[in-house]
Every structure is written in structure tokens, then in C-alpha cells.
């Protein structure tokens, strides 16, 4: 399998997000990398599904709450920027205060 660097990045994000989902399902609070991976994966998948940038900016704030993450993690992530591929090209999606 010959993957581009971008495809490798997406695969790494997916793997980290899958691990985060499993840990969250077991009742564990997520750390910084897990939280970022889960939100990023949700944005990438939403773009693939055809959602708009505005929809993804809003949806990115609904993925996790403070109760889902370890103490201090929400403050460590003031915003997340994801370069996602949409049907009409690649766009930058910025989610401000992603963990409410």
C-alpha cells in the first residue's frame, strides 16, 4: 500500500480517534491527544459526508464536554483547525472552544 503523507495523517487521526472512542465508552476521561483526535476525526468524516464548513464548526463543539476529558484539557484546546476535503475542494475548518 502506497499512501501519501496526507493519507497517512488521516489514518493516524482515525486510529487515535478509534482508541479515544473505546476509552470513552469504558468511562475513561480523555487526555489532550485523544480529545483532539476525536474532534478532528468527526470534522473529517463530516466533510466527507458533505456537511458545510459552518455545520462542522458547530458540530465540532458538540463532540465532547468537560465531563468527557481530564481536568485542564478543555483549557488546553482553545481552538482546533482541520484541513478537510469537501466535494468542492479543501477548506480549513476552525472550531473555537471545542470542549464546552
From Swiss-Prot:
Gene3D superfamilies: Urease, gamma-like subunit (3.30.280.10). Its EC number is 3.5.1.5. It catalyses: urea + 2 H2O + H(+) = hydrogencarbonate + 2 NH4(+). The keyword Hydrolase applies. It is an enzyme of class 3 (hydrolase). One of its GO terms (molecular function) is nickel cation binding. Belongs to the urease gamma subunit family. This is Urease subunit gamma. It comes from Methylibium petroleiphilum (strain ATCC BAA-1232 / LMG 22953 / PM1).
